[in-house]
Regions:
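Mid-to-C-terminal alpha-helical segments outside catalytic/metal-binding sites
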Residues: 86, 132, 136-155, 161-190
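Catalytic pocket-lining loop regions of alpha/beta-barrel enzymes
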Residues: 2-153
């Protein structure tokens, strides 16, 4: 990374079917942390895609769930605790994670025997530990992201060159009635 002057890497939401908290990935996370690198997580190899063979469901439903799976595996697996300075960012507004944080937190509280086996810290405590991108396709969803994590934890998303990306990156932000400072914080110069 240093030789090529890279600031970070992109990985999938799972690697060869292994969740991101798998011990095989600890050396990668340790090296990234030591280098001060960022890790961008994009969903791929979607779980359950065999059951979603019509209507483009793997991309419409599977990808948001896959991203939530990645975030949950990292936080329940204690990766944010092991590497507190490691910077993670997640595509598509963090998938379904932020929309289901209440359910995730409730599950953690009522079933710690299943959820808190590797990390006993409340999932809600992690909302300021990572970034998400702005590509959520809907102003209400973008407003919700801002409410949950703050505009300083949201980066401009494009999903280029994929068809679910914005044709003009940042168009949703540009056309919104958000304050100019918020737009700038989201990576869109007003």
């Amino acid at each position: 990374m240093n030789e090529l002057n890279f600031k970070g890497i992109q990985i999938g939401s799972n690697i060869n079917g292994k969740n991101l908290n798998d011990s095989d990935f600890l050396p990668i996370f340790e090296a990234a942390s030591d280098l001060g690198a960022s890790i961008f997580v994009h969903p791929w190899d979607i779980m359950g895609k065999e059951q979603m063979n019509k209507y483009w469901l793997p991309w419409l439903v599977g990808m948001p769930a896959e991203t939530s799976r990645a975030i949950c595996s990292l936080l329940f697996g204690g990766i944010f605790e092991k590497f507190p300075n490691l910077r993670f960012a997640f595509a598509h507004g963090g998938g379904s994670f932020l929309a289901t944080i209440g359910r995730i937190q409730h599950g953690f509280r009522v079933r710690p025997d299943l959820c808190a086996i590797d990390n006993n810290r409340d999932p809600i405590d992690y909302l300021n530990k990572f970034w998400v991108d702005s590509l959520v396709h809907d102003f209400d969803s973008l407003t919700y992201l801002i409410k949950k994590v703050g505009d300083e934890k949201i980066v401009l998303g494009s999903d280029y060159p994929f068809p679910l990306g914005e044709a003009i990156p940042g168009e949703l932000i540009e056309q919104s009635k958000l304050p100019n400072q918020t737009k700038e914080n989201l990576g869109f110069p007003y």
